[in-house]
């Protein structure tokens, strides 16, 4: 029963993450670099540090925790900086491919590499049991099926239909950016692996134990994204976006909403893993579960946002079959163990 609860919590977080780009459409008259930076303040600083505080028992502090593990804290943040590159290109992948296909390809690469590389970096190859590896393979198969549906979509739609669904649609450029985003985004889970000691042991509840490490990763990612966004503000002379006070109430609200929805995936991952401690295979596979469910829900949003409008019934059938495979992959390691 606890395993089911854990998986459901992760699923809720995945749904929230996949919904996080919807509020961005409500942001008015701001350039990409301006709204990306402001939503990042919420997604990578405000809410992660609030979450990390839940792991701190009374009489202690986060600074005390990080000071006690300086090497682990630095490594976690460094992988966060690398993940930040993935975060930047992740946004571009959706710009060129749309929410459904862009998230699918980037998260697929991220799911596979994040799950496989983390135990190897930590010197624990034994964590990669046969059931975990099979689960990763099935996940990648599901994402490949969705990628095939995306390719079928690109072949069947006219240029006008492509632009109507995704304004800057560019399949070739989008594929390249999405694969890079996935590779660099896998560093998030590697960072979480190095940050495993960042908690107060038995004084921290299992459901909160990864949250201090999550904050260090997002802090590193914020540094990368903030540097790039401020550079783009300077280059594009878009600093004026921040001075238009008439837009602040609306844009701040939707940036904050996007930020809390985005962070929910890692808050949910931490809570969910707290219920999976009896299953070593699912603990190792939890990253892949989160990414797979992100893909599932991102494609649900893609359908809702009519990104698949005009596609043949065959293309939609391929898409749905890929979603079904991903759902099955989420609990496959537990069945096979």
Specify the residue positions occupied by each region the protein language model found.
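Polytopic alpha-helical membrane proteins, predominantly small-molecule transporters/carriers
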Residues: 1-337
């Amino acid at each position: 029963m606890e395993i089911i609860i854990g998986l459901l919590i992760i699923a809720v977080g995945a749904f929230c993450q996949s919904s996080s780009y919807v509020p961005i459409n409500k942001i008015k008259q701001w350039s990409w670099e301006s709204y990306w930076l402001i939503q990042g303040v919420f997604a990578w600083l405000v809410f992660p540090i609030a979450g990390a505080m839940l792991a701190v028992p009374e009489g202690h502090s986060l600074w005390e925790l990080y000071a006690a593990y300086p090497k682990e804290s630095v490594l976690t943040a460094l992988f966060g900086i690398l993940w930040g590159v993935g975060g930047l290109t992740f946004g571009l992948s959706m710009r060129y491919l749309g929410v459904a296909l862009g998230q699918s390809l980037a998260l697929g690469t991220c799911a596979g590499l994040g799950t496989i590389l983390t135990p190897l970096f930590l010197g624990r190859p034994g964590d990669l049991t046969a059931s975990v590896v099979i689960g990763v393979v099935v996940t990648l198969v599901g994402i490949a099926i969705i990628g095939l549906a995306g390719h079928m979509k690109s072949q069947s739609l006219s240029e006008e239909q492509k632009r109507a669904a995704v304004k800057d649609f560019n399949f070739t450029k989008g594929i390249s950016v999405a694969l890079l985003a996935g590779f660099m985004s896998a560093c998030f889970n590697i960072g979480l692996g190095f940050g495993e000691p960042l908690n107060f042991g038995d004084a921290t509840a299992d459901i909160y134990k990864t949250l201090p490490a999550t904050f260090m990763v997002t802090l590193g990612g914020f540094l990368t994204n903030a540097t790039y966004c401020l550079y783009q503000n300077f280059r594009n002379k878009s600093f004026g976006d921040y001075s238009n006070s008439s837009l602040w109430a609306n844009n701040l609200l939707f940036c904050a909403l996007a930020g809390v929805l985005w962070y929910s995936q890692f808050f949910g991952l931490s809570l969910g893993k707290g219920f999976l401690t009896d299953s070593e295979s699912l603990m190792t596979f939890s990253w892949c579960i989160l990414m797979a469910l992100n893909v599932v829900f991102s494609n649900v949003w893609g359908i809702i946002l009519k990104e698949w409008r005009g596609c043949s019934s065959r293309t939609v059938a391929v898409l749905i079959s890929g979603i079904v495979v991903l759902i099955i992959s989420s609990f496959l390691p537990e069945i096979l163990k």
